[in-house]
A protein has these predicted regions:
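Class I SAM-dependent methyltransferase Rossmann-like catalytic core
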Residues: 3-36
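Conserved class I S-adenosyl-L-methionine
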Residues: 41-50
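Conserved SAM-binding loop of SAM-dependent methyltransferases across substrates and taxa
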Residues: 51-64
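Conserved SAM-binding motif I beta-strand of class I
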Residues: 67-72
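A short glycine-rich, Lys/Arg-flanked "PGG" loop and its adjoining helix->strand segment in the class I
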Residues: 129-141
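Conserved beta-strand signature within the Rossmann-like core of class I S-adenosyl-L-methionine
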Residues: 139-149
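Core SAM-dependent methyltransferase catalytic element
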Residues: 170-186
């Protein structure tokens, strides 16, 4: 119970960066990760992992030779993520705006997949535009950018970057229900 209380407290205190007041459901995590060919993946990047609700699901699917790098700016969520003792997990206290710079420091050139829980529709446009363009540039060809949002308001922006290479899904068993955008870099 205390984990949920702490999440709620942090989320309310930092709503503009968390974008929610409850962790993602297991149903949303499953829908976001469905269709990813984990056998072929070397690097997954997670933006805004919060308390790790989706992080744990990614780690359970990663093959032994793969790495998950998480970007989290909230101190309390960062501390929670650092408690996950997993050899394939790297947690950075860094903004998603700096994805390329931070990942290059770790010795990687491109990401196979970027999974984002960032509230892009409420983050200032200049910042969300930078995050989206940097993410696109850092994806491998045929790489996936997977994003959930609670409305369709960000669809147009994703379409400007990914064109028609977007699949839209809906997950009703999340609070609030969420739209899942699966975007491919083709």
């Amino acid at each position: 119970m205390s984990k949920k209380f702490n999440f709620f407290k942090e989320a309310v205190k930092n709503y503009k960066t968390s974008g929610t007041v409850v962790p993602s459901s297991k149903f949303l995590a499953k829908k976001m990760l469905k269709g990813i060919d984990f056998k072929a993946i070397k690097l997954v990047v997670e933006l805004g992992p919060g308390n790790g609700a989706i992080t744990h699901n990614i780690l359970n699917k990663l093959p032994a030779n793969s790495i998950l790098v998480c970007f989290e700016i909230n101190d309390a969520f960062y501390d929670e993520l650092k408690k996950i003792n997993h050899p394939q997990l790297i947690v950075l206290k860094a903004s998603a705006e700096n994805i390329k710079e931070e990942i290059l420091k770790l010795g990687f050139n491109k990401a196979d997949c970027i999974v984002s829980s960032l509230p892009l529709s409420i983050i200032p446009n200049e910042i969300s535009d930078t995050i989206l363009s940097e993410s696109y540039a850092f994806l491998k060809q045929k790489g996936q950018f997977i994003q959930y949002q609670y409305s369709l308001s960000y669809y147009k922006k994703l379409k400007e970057v990914f064109g028609n290479n977007i699949t839209l899904n809906f997950e009703p068993f999340n609070f609030p229900p969420a739209f899942v955008y699966k975007c491919s870099k083709n």
